[in-house]
């Protein structure tokens, strides 16, 4: 199914007609301010080129009576999500692929301070799964980004929801954007216009600028701490000693 596309840009939807494929030029668009309709259409075309690369890796995560989103980051079924979505380490989950396949999973690590959570598909796989590439650097304020998620819950007829926006703040090491998120989006991915994963949706706010995302550096730290067998998971140095509040979606 086609994704539900919602582009929030100063209250104006990007509804340019489909354009022929062109070479990706996300780097040149990342922090540029559109000066014309043509600029807006370039941004939308770039987004349309990236979606086929990343949508196959988007998953829905079901736990008890709730659900959230996640993104595959390895061909062997490793999933990044929000800690409040995957719950504590060892929790059993259902991970639903884009084609509707439901697979058993388990939470392998989480940090409630940063709200970073990692899960893994536990069933034996007979094929490599689609996955996305993680960005090596933090985004900059003003960068164009897009958010994916199963907002409102999994709906295969509608498809996943896509939101376009910009980074508005990097306060305390947390990414804040104006990508409008709703319940069910938590744990979903945030990408730059090159299609690289830069964050995971954590807090869903009522305002356009109230949406927070966990950056990749917190997942990298969590992965390293887990590999080293550490049991005490602490926030990254760039964050306040007090955790920011998370609002499950």
What are these regions (language model features)?
Residues 71-72, 180-201:
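Catalytic nucleophile loop of clan PA
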Residues 61, 91-99, 145-149:
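Short conserved beta-strand and strand-loop elements enriched in small hydrophobics
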Residues 1-7:
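Bacterial N-terminal signal peptides that target proteins for export
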Residues 17-21:
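Sec/Tat signal peptide C-region and signal peptidase I cleavage site
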Residues 67, 74-116, 123-126:
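Catalytic-histidine neighborhood of serine endopeptidases
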Residues 44-47, 57-76, 102-104, 187, ...:
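A conserved glycine-rich beta-strand in the N-terminal activation segment of trypsin-fold
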Residues 25-51, 93, 127-129, 151-154, ...:
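C-terminal cap/linker of serine protease catalytic domains
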Residues 128-174, 178-185, 201-212:
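Flexible, gly/ser-rich surface segments that form the specificity/activation loops bordering the active-site cleft
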